[in-house]
Amino acid sequence: MAKGIFIVGTDTDIGKTVVTAGLMHVLRSRGYNAVYFKAALSGALEIDNKLIPSDTKLVSDVSKLEEPYENITPYVYRTGVSPHLAARLENNPMDLDIVKEKYVYLKEKYDFIIAEGSGGIVCPLIDDGRGVYTIGNLIKDLNMSVIIVASAGLGTINHTVLTAKYIENLGIKIEGIIINKYEKDLFYDDNIGMIEKITKLPIVAKLKNIKDMNDNEIEAIRIHSEKAFSAENIIKHMEQL
């Protein structure tokens, strides 16, 4: 039976896709049968009249994952807004049964699943008149625990603590926090220490700020993730699905 973890960011564009790509690379490059899953992506690329989920492409390219995009990201939207609104604008509402079918398929095919959210923990996926269904609801339905991706910079204490407390209030287990865009600095280190004290959560890893992303994005992520993560530590924080 597969083991897995759900990656949640404290905000949009916090770098959780880069972190997820790095985690996937470390596992797969060491022979672990790992797969990526993202239920919905908005703001997709359009290449040759076909929508390409950019996050899914990046993770797949970095980790050399060859699973078809439609199996690991079942809902892809062109419009770069929250998935619930993109679904309404493009008349393509999410069907949770399809999302869960894809997830079960991946659980049966792979040994490890790293899932990634859209936006933050409260990002709405569905708003169909019966209530709002968020990333938090999806995590509970998939019965996954989470790792929070946070920055080390200004505002991170507030963002990270609020995210952690909200997740805990949902009854979801938090395995720890990964700090992204980290540099050795008194200010950053004090922020990280304060987050640990207030949340009582471990810092799982710190990923450096990847400054050479534009030159060779894929190779830069691989190199820096190998310094920040170990396969054993990643697996240690996964739970049976």
Swiss-Prot record:
ATP binds at residues 13-18, 55, 116-119, 180-181. The active site is at residue 38. Substrate binds at residue 42. Its EC number is 6.3.3.3. Mg(2+) binds at residues 17, 55, 116. GO terms for cellular component: cytosol. GO terms for molecular function: ATP binding; dethiobiotin synthase activity; magnesium ion binding. It is found in: Cytoplasm. Keywords: ATP-binding, Biotin biosynthesis, Cytoplasm, Ligase, Magnesium, Metal-binding, Nucleotide-binding. It catalyses: (7R,8S)-7,8-diammoniononanoate + CO2 + ATP = (4R,5S)-dethiobiotin + ADP + phosphate + 3 H(+). Transmembrane segments: none annotated. Homodimer. This is ATP-dependent dethiobiotin synthetase BioD.
